[in-house]
């Protein structure tokens, strides 16, 4: 490339053109040439590279940052983005990029003069004759041109590179080439974008130009209009900067943009393609650009010329032998009699190396010599194994493994050379010993499975670099490569740990594309012991100005004094004159470090490394898969920042004794005038997600900062957790590939979507602290720790526990708890804060809540406008103290359905609600709270004083111990509510209203704690209100308490300057409904007795159908019954036994023993519960030859009962009972035929059922209920009809029957007692009709099986259905 140029006047164009001063008579030739390409009289000028001259010209009313971001795919312009808005500097919409998804410009070289169109080829204009190398992506790579491939007649060339490019994906090439008018087809080509570099200008609407930067400082890009001419050349007028036809971001290419690409979106192929390279422009004040369309035929031929003949392996023959002569640069691959000639590097000519393509399944190659293939690469169409004789190596441009192939590579490389790998297929590294070469991979999978040599040494590569976002490297084991020599370049790739334990002491990751993962079933362990730093430190030496100047503190400078070069380290940002006043002697400005250059450089380098060792570590990449990650204590207390992402669904990330920060990532922008790509004060950040099973913190400081969401449980041991932290770090070199330069600061998001989010359960131990300043969903368990809330969006969805731990909702915070909470301390609420205690929303329902319990030591409302809300199925306990004007809401005026409880805790909470929407148990003190109740229950836990009380359809009661309560209210407004007070006939609970009382339809109920004497007058004041209060505000209410309906007798006294409601006495009567429920509960034992009775004689009945001998048997029965009052039960009954046959004169006597187990449950309007019964007995059955029989049985049963009553405050009771049974049955089997019989029966069962007594309190009233032992006597008469069916070796007896079962004695008496007296409920008799049908079958000579179905009807208690199956084995 000519770097010496000048501006010359051209008489043909009438303007200046740029020419090389090394060219011969260029001016005359150029002027003539331009006469053939004038458009609308505008001169065209060649665009020479890299002449520092005019270049991209863009609109001045759009921020220059937009054009910079566009060119580098940064900011809004990420590849694939759609409908991108473009605004001017005033915030007005200029237009939208809505004709195509955003293009990916990564294939454009870093300097903008060439574009990668194949892994080894770029395109540009041939008059760019001086550049010798290109780089891509973040520019941290260099590829040399080995052949320029200049077109003979067109200003175009397609240089070949020395290696396969791994960092980026080549651009797709237009399929239409130079076809006439191809790119004027707006239906197929919907958008045209360009990118280039050079001297930068902006233009206003008046055409005034302002220089922005010198040539090749950076790239800009933008839109161009549909071509005016489209053939071998594309011509358009992007210099008409404000013409809408050029799109919202017009960019006019000028000198310095030579060779830069023009892309078009091919709607037909749904992709962007490169169509041309920029050749000329019409002058700085012109408008027209000329592009040379890609000559696709020429390009294809150029690439084809670099291939040797393809090699086709023949299966079944020996491997291909590869020999190579380094001197001649040629080699031979031979298989049998067939040979293929190949060409490699000759002397220093890399381009002499040709590409080889291999095909043939399961191919094999053996290198007989070391091969130096130069710029030639290997491409495998099929799977191959490539090996080498001892010590033989291969170098070249790289390897391509096509999709679906697996190439096993057993050849080591050369130190200082990298093996470049592309292609979607797999490359398995399987050599031996230490491979000194490196790996750069840009696509597909590389499996590192190097084998150890005889000395045990193994190394697959000296270094590994992943780039482009496409490749995966799989570690065969942890020894394959030094992890610290693994790096991720532009857009990165995946490192698969493959179940291994790997330790990194440094992470070299350029961007978010860097991924460490584990896809193996065996969990990997990743240790990030980040101690080491990049030792590649550059120490530039600046010159000291004798007149003073500015510089960078810490940098090295030199000055020649007295013929000797002296070296200094600058200590300040500026320094003074060194001629007089000599600032070099000022230690605040300079530090002298000697005259030895090497020692001075080393001093600075050591200080830089020492500083880096203390710097925080930031990882921009991703941690994913099946692994645990551990960050141990790092030297110097180094902080670790993750602004990439973590996805470890079954993994644990552990941090020990350090600072760990999860944060979002600032959107990277292109640099303008030296600006950093990111900053602390920028508004646009990318969200990042962190998912893991557990985050484990020990002695750590953890921050979840803006734009980060964490989904994980957290285990904290003596650690500090900040959710919603404003602490962030930005990398001033983010996206550049340069060494990380971190800047710490604060950043507060402006929108809700930019705030951090947490979901999970946190456990705090050993003085841990949790500060919640952002959205929180989950649970908290705190032990000897502290929790502070400032976020307005904290949702506790799991039960909360705070033991020895504080919970504070600070100013503006809002805590919503949905699943219960326990705290042994007070919960604090600050100014404008809110605490909401609610039931648990039922999934997939609109407005259902399961009850929940909140048990705390209290609530302190310390800030003005603090709010405590107890609602939708919540029962809260704990005193409330309002030291500031605050609000307490209990219940809700919005209907909410309380769902049936699915857990014990929820059932308990539901019982405490007593049918109300919400409930509170405790005192409210301080006198400053405004309390409102809607469909709510407040149980006064102590004397209370509040400012205002609004009550709607609610109840306020005073229950608990025998201490009387006083409720003092400044203003009371109550409607449709109950006020329940207590009295011991001397004193009582009281309500005092000091300022105003209003309302109506309220009932005043009074519970007495001992029986009042007959006719006793009490005269006890209950409610005191200001004079003038309506006497109709309270009416005496009737309350069902215990087994009675109690109504106080009141009178209203308006004397003494106030209005009082005074208790005179009581009127009590029995509550028949409660008594009936109690009787039903107490009679559950009778129903259990009947269950056993119905199964008592089943075994003896079977004997009459078996004609068997001694044997063992088993039976299982299942049934369900029902009775009045919503009663229903079901049971499963198991019997096992053994009996023996005694043959006597005219009679067969069977005697046996049985054991039984019954599991039953019952439910009714009054109660629900379960009984487990275990018993045993003896039985005998006499079968007479005449057909008569007698059955006898005695049995004992023990019952273990758990029942919950929903009447009179009974609650759950666990108790044991027992019962005895003595049964006798007789009957006669008449045979109508040999197979058919009829059998009349009579049975009598006498039993004993133990009694039970329960004592408890309903409020302050003592209650008891009792039934004594009783002895049922039950008779049954009936008839059965049966028939036996038999064959050669089988028989089946089928039977059906009906009978009448009846009680001969009344059931036991129930005695109920409460404060109003004793009530006796006499036992009753019951009877029912029984129906049964069944069969008994002989399976083998000594085995029988029986099945029977039963049902009853017409009784107060009936068996709805029952089935029993039995099995007998006879000896």
UniProtKB/Swiss-Prot annotation:
Q: Which InterPro entries match?
A: Autotransporte_beta, Autotransporte_beta_dom_sf, Autotransporter_pectin_lyase_C, Bact_Autotransporter_VF, OM_autotransptr_brl_dom, Pectin_lyase_fold/virulence, Peptidase_S6, Peptidase_S6_dom
* Active-site residue numbers: 127 (charge relay system), 155 (charge relay system), 258 (charge relay system)
**GO terms for cellular component:** cell outer membrane; cell surface; extracellular region; periplasmic space
Q: Which Pfam families match?
A: Autotransporter, Beta-sol_PIC_HAP1_IgA0_2nd, Peptidase_S6
Transmembrane stretches in the record are: none
Q: Please indicate if the UniProt record lists Protease as a keyword.
A: yes
Could you list this entry's UniProt keywords, alphabetically sorted.
Answer: Cell outer membrane, Hydrolase, Membrane, Periplasm, Protease, Secreted, Serine protease, Signal, Transmembrane, Transmembrane beta strand, Virulence, Zymogen
Please list the GO biological process terms of this entry: proteolysis
Record PROSITE patterns: AUTOTRANSPORTER, PEPTIDASE_S6
> What are the GO MF terms of this UniProt record?
serine-type endopeptidase activity
Q: Does the keyword Hydrolase apply?
A: yes
Q: Which PANTHER family match?
A: AUTOTRANSPORTER (PTHR12338), HEME_HEMOPEXIN-BINDING PROTEIN (PTHR12338:SF8)
Q: What does this protein do?
A: Involved in virulence of uropathogenic E.coli although it is not known how it contributes to it. Has no mucinase activity.
Its UniProt domain note says: The signal peptide, cleaved at the inner membrane, guides the autotransporter protein to the periplasmic space. Then, insertion of the C-terminal translocator domain in the outer membrane forms a hydrophilic pore for the translocation of the passenger domain to the bacterial cell surface, with subsequent cleavage.
Its name, as the record gives it, is: Serine protease pic autotransporter
Organism classification = Bacteria, Pseudomonadati, Pseudomonadota, Gammaproteobacteria, Enterobacterales
